[in-house]
Design a protein with these regions (language model features):
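Bacterial Sec-dependent N-terminal signal peptides
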Residues: 1-26
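Active-site-proximal alpha-helical
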Residues: 198-228, 237-293
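Non-catalytic terminal regions of proteins
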Residues: 38-41, 271-342
């Protein structure tokens, strides 16, 4: 009996210790402290090597449900309360909650929503946090924030050409031979150049510098190997290539896709981005691409890419899907004479 009581007591003690350990593990303050430690370590390891500035700064994690803040430092007005090595408070009601960089209490802060941070996937969490930290520093490295002005990517011609570009970028990331990488990169650039000739009132390149470089930086510093990153990007490119709405999101995939392709082709390209150059221009120079002289010649080149990728069925199916969607919504369907007929 005594032996059984000892065993039972040991079981209870073990259970209590396990529950206590799990409770500590799930304590949001301790979690946040660990998240900040990892982020600080990542940014300190880079220490400006990538962009010339250390990306670590004021960071707050916000619970959307109750607007509770857990921050890595005190705010200027000293209104946050220190506890467990972090600072807690409440975000004012007139301040929006998002994954973003914003000015608060006289400082530029990085904000991340608590429920957007994976407790189990360090790489995914750090990628998001680094992405937003980069936004807080982007103007200091010469890149202005912009809103997308690319509604053509949600329309038939623009959408198809963008999705073909994504297919080309996927092939470039998967290629091993240097000439193959350049060839597929050239295909992507020709598709973009043609699309931008058809839709000149776009800011694709500017939006790509804004969101694409944030996402590239998140990937570059999050802790994944280059091979792991390229595999993840290929998977994501396949997902994006199935979307009929890309105006607001394309740069999150094209930016890192071009970035990690350029990493395999050249060095020092980030310095060119900082001085105002766009990724397609840098990639064209690196690949030795000379664009066809006019839209008609571009049309011929793009039609050749469609044939090379056996994408005729994809183009036809996507055109039909857009037509059906327009008919369902009562919109007027228009066939654009500029678009290739295959």
């Amino acid at each position: 009996m005594k032996k059984n009581l000892i065993l039972f007591g040991s079981f209870i003690l073990l259970t209590l210790l396990t529950v206590t350990a799990k409770a500590q593990e799930m304590d949001p303050l301790l979690q946040a402290k660990e998240y900040f430690r990892q982020l600080d370590s990542i940014c300190s390891a880079d220490n400006g090597l990538l962009w010339g500035v250390n990306l670590y700064g004021p960071v707050m994690l916000v619970s959307p449900a109750d607007r509770v803040i857990i921050a890595n430092r005190q705010n200027k007005s000293n209104t946050l309360v220190e506890k467990e090595g972090v600072f807690i408070g409440r975000l004012p009601d007139n301040t929006g909650i998002a994954n973003t960089a914003f000015e608060w209490d006289g400082e530029l802060w990085t904000m991340a929503m608590w429920n957007a941070l994976s407790p189990d996937d360090n790489n995914a969490r750090n990628r998001l946090l680094v992405h937003e930290c980069w936004h807080a520093k982007q103007q200091s490295v010469g890149i202005m924030p912009v809103m997308t002005q690319n509604t053509h990517l949600d329309q038939e011609e623009g959408n198809i050409l963008m999705r073909l570009e994504l297919m080309a970028l996927s092939r470039a990331l998967q290629a091993v031979d240097l000439q193959e990488i350049k060839s597929y990169t050239t295909d992507a650039l020709l598709l973009r150049h043609y699309r931008q000739a058809l839709f000149p009132n776009n800011n694709e390149n500017e939006f790509e510098r804004h969101e694409g470089m944030a996402e590239y930086t998140g990937y570059r510093l999050c802790g994944m190997s280059d091979l792991e990153i390229r595999k993840q990007l290929v998977t994501d490119l396949e997902t994006y290539a199935g979307k009929t709405a890309l105006a607001n999101s394309f740069a999150y995939i094209t930016g890192p896709a071009y970035g990690f392709t350029l990493d395999r082709l050249t060095t020092g390209w980030i310095g060119k981005v900082r001085t105002g150059e766009a990724l397609p221009g840098i990639a064209a120079e690196t690949s030795g691409l000379t664009y066809p002289p006019d839209t008609l010649a571009l049309h011929v080149a793009v039609s050749g890419i469609v044939e090379k990728y056996n994408a005729g069925v994809f183009v036809a199916a996507t055109k039909e899907a857009f037509k059906e969607e327009m008919l369902e919504t009562g919109a007027c369907y228009r066939y654009d004479r500029h678009y290739f007929r295959i």
